[in-house]
């Protein structure tokens, strides 16, 4: 298999990254160790190479109105310098992917450009789907990453580190806010233009940065010199799972609706605009989904993994979608689907792990919330 390499691939290897195939890319699963990386992000700061993810630019007349036909979230709620999390839907309300939409316009009344970040595993199919539905309306799609670097800097010290390196004040940038920042000392072109968004996939404060390859390599080395430890896919998974953030392809897929996945807050049925799957979701909103994604805590140290059966009265009633040992909580946690009648907080079920039944309790999500910044 010919795996793709990000511009930081050799730097990840040099930093001790243990590389594994992931969504067609050769990516680091860990560096110093999952526990150390996890704790660094929770307590200080860590960085992730996420350059495998897809980044598309949408340009034309009112691209937001055109994209609106494919997502259930009211995109008019965001303006220039703002972003939102949403999902791409098919005709039956099934989730094709989750994504973040960034408004790159100069004013809310005349937004001509959007940036969207999509999952690596869905990048090709998403692009085909978007072109099929957006290009006939005159919206042009292009690769905004352009073989560049997408870097996540996450943790309570992320703001201080990034302010020190950039010379910019970033503390006031709101969650899901974004801006272009001019960085000095990142290569031949001085200054380098860096897209910075206050977004992430860890449950911590932090930023995601999009920049050209050479500037990204220089920034990686500067962050290493600052003592920021590199983190791999392993700790990214334990961090996102503690925060109960969905992983597409495991916790939701084309056969899952937002209401089933606990993402009903993304569905804005009060807006008049039509969107893909609206009729199906209106019906499900009225009747209620027959199953729901739940958070689970297991007694003991056994780990529930994707696909493990969920049992009630010794009968299979659902499946685990994601599970891990939580370094922050010292408990085994998991996400999974249960019939709505069994999905209430406090309900007891069991997980079948290697032929044995392990008690589990339905709990409130997320499992972990970062301490208040105040």
UniProtKB/Swiss-Prot annotation:
The keyword Protein transport does not apply. InterPro entries: GCS_T, GCS_T_bac, GCST_C, GCV_T_N, GcvT/YgfZ/DmdA, GcvT/YgfZ_C, TrmE/GcvT_dom1. GO terms for cellular component: cytosol; glycine cleavage complex. The keyword Chloroplast does not apply. Pfam families: GCV_T, GCV_T_C. Keywords: Aminotransferase, Transferase. One of its GO terms (molecular function) is transaminase activity. One of its GO terms (biological process) is glycine decarboxylation via glycine cleavage system. Its EC number is 2.1.2.10. SUPFAM superfamilies: Aminomethyltransferase beta-barrel domain, Folate-binding domain. It is an enzyme of class 2 (transferase). It comes from the Bacteria. It catalyses: N(6)-[(R)-S(8)-aminomethyldihydrolipoyl]-L-lysyl-[protein] + (6S)-5,6,7,8-tetrahydrofolate = N(6)-[(R)-dihydrolipoyl]-L-lysyl-[protein] + (6R)-5,10-methylene-5,6,7,8-tetrahydrofolate + NH4(+). Belongs to the GcvT family. The glycine cleavage system is composed of four proteins: P, T, L and H. The glycine cleavage system catalyzes the degradation of glycine. NCBIfam families: gcvT, PRK00389.1. This is Aminomethyltransferase. It comes from Prochlorococcus marinus (strain MIT 9303). The gene is gcvT.
């Amino acid at each position: 298999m010919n795996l793709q390499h990000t511009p930081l691939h050799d730097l990840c290897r040099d930093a001790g990254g243990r590389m594994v195939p992931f969504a067609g890319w050769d990516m680091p699963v860990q560096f110093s160790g999952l526990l150390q990386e996890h704790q660094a992000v929770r307590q200080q700061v860590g960085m992730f190479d996420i350059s495998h993810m897809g980044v598309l630019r949408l340009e034309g007349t009112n691209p937001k109105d055109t994209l609106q036909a494919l997502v259930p979230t009211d995109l008019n709620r965001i303006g220039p310098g703002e972003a939102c999390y949403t999902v791409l839907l098919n005709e039956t309300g099934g989730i094709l992917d989750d994504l973040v939409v960034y408004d790159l316009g100069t004013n809310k009344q005349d937004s001509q450009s959007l940036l969207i970040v999509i999952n690596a595993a869905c990048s090709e199919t998403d692009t085909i789907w978007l072109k099929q539905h957006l290009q006939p309306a005159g919206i042009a799609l292009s690769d905004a990453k352009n073989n560049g670097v997408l870097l996540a800097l996450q943790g309570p010290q992320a703001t201080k580190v990034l302010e020190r390196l950039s010379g910019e004040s970033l503390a006031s940038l709101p969650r899901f806010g974004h801006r272009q920042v001019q960085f000095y000392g990142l290569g031949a072109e001085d200054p380098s233009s860096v897209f910075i968004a206050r977004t992430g996939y860890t449950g911590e404060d932090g930023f995601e940065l999009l920049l050209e390859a050479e500037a990204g390599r220089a920034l990686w080395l500067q962050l290493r010199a600052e003592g920021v430890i590199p983190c791999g896919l392993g700790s990214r998974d334990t961090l996102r799972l503690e925060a109960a953030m969905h992983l597409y392809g495991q916790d939701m897929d084309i056969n899952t609706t937002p209401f089933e996945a606990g993402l009903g807050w993304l569905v804005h049925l009060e807006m008049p605009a039509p969107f893909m799957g609206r009729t199906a979701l209106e019906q499900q909103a009225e009747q209620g989904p027959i199953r729901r994604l739940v958070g689970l805590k297991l007694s003991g140290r056994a780990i529930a993994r994707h696909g493990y059966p969920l049992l009630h009265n010794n009968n299979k009633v659902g499946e685990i979608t994601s599970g891990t040992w939580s370094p922050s909580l010292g408990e085994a946690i998991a996400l999974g689907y249960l019939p709505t009648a069994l999905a209430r907080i406090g309900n007891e079920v069991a997980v079948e792990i290697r032929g044995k039944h392990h008690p589990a309790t339905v709990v409130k999500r997320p499992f972990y919330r970062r301490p208040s910044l105040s």
